[in-house]
Regions:
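Conserved N-terminal structural module of periplasmic/extracytoplasmic solute-binding proteins
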Residues: 1-58
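Short amphipathic alpha-helical coupling segments at ligand-binding clamshell hinges
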Residues: 3, 189-193, 278-290, 357
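Hinge/lid segment of periplasmic solute-binding proteins
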Residues: 52-107, 136, 245-254
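Short, solvent-exposed loop/beta-turn-alpha elements that line the ligand-binding surface or hinge
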Residues: 70-81, 124-128, 152, 171-189, ...
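Extracytoplasmic/periplasmic solute-binding protein
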Residues: 95-101, 106, 133-180, 219-221
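Glycine-centered hinge/linker elements that transmit conformational signals in sensory
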Residues: 136-140, 176-208, 248, 253
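Extracytoplasmic/periplasmic substrate-recognition and gating elements
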Residues: 199-202, 239-311
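C-terminal capping/gating helix-and-loop segments adjacent to ligand/active sites or protein-protein/ligand interfaces
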Residues: 264, 326-363
């Protein structure tokens, strides 16, 4: 809302454009709100001109009813954005319905104090965690060394399984009804690698948020959203009440050795409802302003999200406005920059009902 106010006082005032926030909704509920507004009726909310949503919400409204950002931005302008982030907001025919403003991904966060003791005793290093093979091997060694404690809590294990399988060359492993083909040999082996580690107690599925389990010393590390950085403390408080510095270490998502690395991406984008050409141009003006490199980095750096412009990524190395604890944020964005440079972003599955099935799987 502060950014909207700043836009209205500056560029908006200069160009005769005013953005007004009319409704606030969670990402999980915005789709239903938009469909209700589109349907209309006496008690229906007013359809907003500009809104954030997921691509599945956008396509449900109908591509013909939405602004194609390709028509509002030149090819040269779009070339300045991370290609995979743009692709995440496109339909199959290339229509750009959702303009990216920020993206989160998954990576590894470790209790550095605890890892130092583990490393000294076993020789396992942070470098060993760069591959899935090394990650699962380290998890087994930690279990043995610690006397039966889990090494890592995973927030979205099925996504990790997917990335590992695709990096191993699984190809398409989705069925027509929007689930996983267990007859796909490569996908099945990726799943079994995780399942074996889970059954042996080397890793666990998180109790909602893996960062909590790291901060209480229940696990040594977490594999979850980059946005979890917001919730990490400077100290680890163990179950017996003892404390020590967290010394948080943030590492890129493990990848398959010798393969092209993939990374998850999540986050809503900006979508404009098609009404008048004047409103579409005003929406594009706001999106340009919001995604300018420096402003985009300032916007995301407080939350653990990734900027969407290549130029914003380039500025991370010398960025000096991270919140406290500064070193944790610095490590996070150094890891994100590595991933932006050498990993390919992968969109989440778009099957209807997919997320409900995933929730049932975790339960």
């Amino acid at each position: 809302d502060l950014l909207v106010q700043k836009f209205n006082r500056t560029v908006g005032q200069e160009k005769g454009v005013r953005v007004q926030v009319t409704n606030l909704s969670s990402a999980s509920k915005i789709g239903g709100f938009l469909k209700e507004a589109q349907k209309g009726g006496r008690d229906a909310p007013e359809m907003p001109d500009l809104f954030t949503c997921h691509i599945s919400d956008a396509t449900a409204l109908g591509s013909d009813n939405l602004v194609d950002w390709n028509a509002r931005f030149t090819a040269e302008e779009l070339s300045n954005f991370v290609p995979g982030f743009l692709a995440d907001g496109m339909t199959e025919d290339g229509t750009l319905l959702l303009f990216p403003i920020s993206k989160s991904t998954q990576l590894l966060m470790c209790n550095g104090s605890g890892f130092a003791r583990f490393s000294q005793a076993t020789g396992v290093s942070y470098a060993d965690l760069s591959t899935w093979e090394g990650f699962y091997d380290a998890a087994g060694k930690f279990y043995d060394w610690s006397g039966g404690e889990a090494f890592c809590a995973l927030d979205y294990p099925i996504r990790s399984v997917e990335l590992n399988a695709l990096e191993h060359g699984s190809g398409d492993f989705y069925t027509k009804n929007g689930w996983y083909d267990t007859n796909n040999v490569v996908f099945k082996e990726s799943w079994m690698q995780f399942a074996r580690s889970l059954a042996q107690g080397h890793v666990v599925v998180s109790d909602l948020y893996s960062n909590t389990q790291v901060m209480t010393g229940d696990v040594l590390s977490s594999l979850g959203s980059s946005a979890a950085i917001l919730y990490y403390n400077d100290t680890v408080t163990y179950r017996d009440g003892t404390q020590e510095p967290m010394d948080l270490h943030v590492l890129p998502m493990p990848k398959t050795a010798g393969a092209d690395a993939l990374m998850a991406q999540a986050g809503v984008g900006l979508c404009a409802y098609k009404t008048t050409d004047q409103k579409a141009e005003a929406a594009a003006l706001f999106v340009r302003w919001l995604t300018e490199s420096e402003r985009n980095l300032d916007f995301v750096a407080q939350t653990g999200y990734m900027p969407v412009r290549n130029g914003a990524f380039d500025a991370i190395e010398n960025y000096d406005k991270f919140p406290e604890p500064t070193e944790s944020y610095r490590q996070l964005y150094a890891a994100l920059k590595i991933m932006q440079e050498s990993y390919t972003p992968l969109s989440e599955p778009r099957f209807e009902g997919y997320y409900g099935k995933v929730s049932q799987l975790y339960d």
